[in-house]
Design a protein with these regions (language model features):
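Membrane helical hairpin/interfacial module
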Residues: 43-86, 90-94
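General N-terminal leader/first-domain-start detector
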Residues: 9-64
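Hydrophobic, aromatic-lined core segments that form the binding pocket/scaffold
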Residues: 169-316
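Short linear interaction motifs
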Residues: 20-21, 93, 259
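Extended cationic-aromatic binding surfaces that line active-site or macromolecule-binding grooves
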Residues: 75-78, 82-98, 102-106, 189-208
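Short, small-residue-biased leader/transition segments that mark boundaries at the very start
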Residues: 1-8
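Internal, well-ordered alpha/beta segment that forms a basic, Gly-enriched binding/recognition surface
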Residues: 95, 103-178
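Local cysteine-cluster metal-coordination motifs and their immediate loop/turn environment
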Residues: 27-45, 83-118, 132-138
């Protein structure tokens, strides 16, 4: 498969691990109670077995609160939030986690401790990052207005690479033995009626995160001609640097999917993603919120990612 093809002597040996990090990874910090769109809501959090055992046997008021918050089924222990109770019951009145306040971050389950960090692997290459569903991640990505490129650091076990070395997304593909023209890594908006109609139809087939997602798709599909005019005006009056970085970051997160899907499919996935973010930014405003919203709907639903990539593969 593709994974074994790219792992040449330049990349790996029996003992070497190479880790890549977007620079925002190193400065990321949870906003906690300052977050307007907390991750402590509206989804199911799987609790690892070791932490679940500790929670179930913990004494005192915190232990009681934890047991009341946990749902147990055949697949294990979970924190389950619903429309009726969207927020984690372990948040105090100030929006701070009771577990962290009493036990520190090491008291969290693996999912809560790691989120929104992600790690993907291609043989001995480790792709690290922080997910765009988190507003703190998106804000960090947007902070550097002097560049429209995502910059990465590289670390390896044997010191072959300098800690001061900086890479672009193109350099990463070169590490993987892909010789691709730099133009493929630059996002170019494509306000076109037929393209937008197909994009909205396709996104309408994804499993919605909530009713608002479906409503938004329907509204955007109502008059694509007017939508094109609005997008063209936005492009003429706004810098596209953030959208280019988002495009590269979306692409980076799915590099490991090249084991199962074509490069063209991965590029289409990233292009469509950032085009949809552009569209919603034009209509709804708040581009940073639109990035996080898209990520929650698409990136954090593996079924939706697979659905889209299978669609793009079927077109070739």
């Amino acid at each position: 498969d593709w994974s074994s093809d790219v792992c040449s002597s330049d990349l790996t040996s029996e003992t070497i691990m190479i880790s890549l990090y977007p620079t925002i990874y190193h400065t990321f910090q949870c906003k906690a109670d300052r977050c307007e769109n907390t991750c402590c809501q509206l989804w199911t959090i799987d609790i690892d077995e070791a932490t679940a055992e500790r929670y179930h046997t913990m004494t005192g008021p915190l232990g009681e609160s934890l047991r009341q918050a946990i749902t147990v089924d055949d697949e294990g222990s979970h924190f389950v939030f619903s429309k009726e109770q969207p927020m984690c019951p372990l948040l105090n009145e100030n929006g701070l986690c009771k577990v962290v306040l009493e036990l520190g971050e090491e008291g969290l389950c693996d999912t809560c401790h790691m989120h929104p960090r992600f790690y993907k692997y291609i043989e001995d290459l480790e792709l690290c990052g922080v997910g765009l569903s988190c507003e703190a991640s998106v804000e960090l990505l947007a902070e550097d207005t002097q560049s429209d490129q995502v910059i990465f650091t590289i670390e390896d076990d044997d010191g072959e690479f300098s800690p001061d070395e900086r890479l672009t997304i193109q350099n990463i593909f070169e590490l993987l033995a892909f010789d691709i023209d730099s133009s493929y890594f630059q996002y170019s908006p494509n306000p076109d009626v037929q393209y937008y109609a197909k994009l909205l139809d396709l996104y309408g087939t994804t499993e919605p995160i909530d009713e608002e997602w479906t409503t938004q798709i329907n509204i955007l599909s109502h008059d694509t001609g007017k939508l094109i005019t609005a997008v063209q005006s936005y492009i003429a009056n706004h810098d596209m640097g953030l959208f280019n970085k988002v495009f590269q970051y979306i692409l980076y997160r799915q590099i490991d999917m090249l084991a199962d899907y074509s490069l063209e499919s991965i590029l289409s996935y990233a292009r469509d993603g950032v085009e949809y973010i552009l569209i919603t930014s034009v209509i709804e405003g708040s581009p940073l919120k639109q990035v996080a919203r898209w990520s929650q709907q698409i990136e954090y639903d593996e079924d939706n990612v697979e659905l889209l990539l299978q669609h793009y593969d079927s077109l070739q």
